Amino acid sequence: GKQVVLKQIHHEPCDYYSFGNKIEAERRDYERLRGAGIRIPEMIAIDTEAEQVVKEYIEGPTIFEMIRDGASAETYLPQAREMADRAKAAGLNIDYFPTNFVARDGLIWYVDYECNDYMDEWSFGNWGIRYWSRTPEFEAYLKEHSGGKQESAE
């Protein structure tokens, strides 16, 4: 059988952002990403009532895990830049944070379906690249999300 991921939409209060209909946004973003030629997992099913999405599971480490564990993401940068170029050509930004990218068989997959209208400030070159190696930003994120101790993959 095929392994899948079940994503349950949750609603958290957020002062600075209005999400609108999140399940419809998920479907719309999936179509926009496919149209832009971004490598994403297949959406297998969507249940608008239960606000659930079933998508293909992409096995492999995230780019974040690789960097955290001492590996380099260098070999994946050309693919990330190609995705960024495709997204920009379609008028989109994707979330370039390295937890959203899984490496499998030499390819990276964008495993989140989130995308937004393109803004240069949030492009890969201006924002995302800052987290694709052991930069001060990456180290600050690690420290902030691990209580100062080494983060574990579990």
Locations of regions flagged by a protein language model:
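The N-lobe alphaC helix and its flanking beta3-alphaC-beta4 segment of protein kinase-like domains
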Residues: S18-A36
